[in-house]
Amino acid sequence: MQGGRIGRPFRILVSTVNRTIESALRFVNLTAAGLLAGSLGFGKAALVPGWTDELPRHDGEPTPVAGYFNAIGPVALGTAVTLAIGASRGVPVRRLLDSAAAVGLAGVLAATIMVTVPINQELEAQPATDYPSDHSQTLVKNWARAHAVRTTLGIASFVCAVAASNIRNHAK
């Protein structure tokens, strides 16, 4: 090291390690975001924290793998934020797509935790009736809207993550 400068071999090693870490983060991000988008679009319960509260369990037993599923949303969000902040500065569009994916995944988690789970808990607390009240119908409509928003955000985030991972660095 001369005059505070990093030598060329070390710079190549750091670049390779950063690309390797970025590739691993992109793999984890794509996997988690894809599972999350799939669970939102096609499943009965979204794989985000609170999903066990969305569908009641009649036997009272906790879901044995709920801990693993609860981690999918936060892992997708964490890797998206890490990629948006720490990814290489090669292509600006990639950083923009990583940022959009992170914002979308944050929206999915926020809509789930702050809207759909409280609505489900309120609906569960209501006594069974022959005809639904106006209030419960309003809650169901609000839940459907929030679910549509979080599904759209989840799928859009996955599309952004796929697009960001397919952008190649251009040779200078």
Model segments located where?
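N-terminal amphipathic/basic-hydrophobic helices that include classical n-h-c signal peptides
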Residues: M1-S15
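A periodicity- and composition-biased signal for non-globular, repetitive helical segments
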Residues: R8-R11, G50, A156
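Glycine-rich, hydrophobic membrane-spanning regions of integral membrane proteins that mediate transport
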Residues: R11-T20, D53-E61, R89
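Acidic/histidine-rich alpha-helical segments that form the ligand environment
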Residues: S99-V115, I119-A128, V140, A144
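A generic hydrophobic-segment detector
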Residues: E124-K172
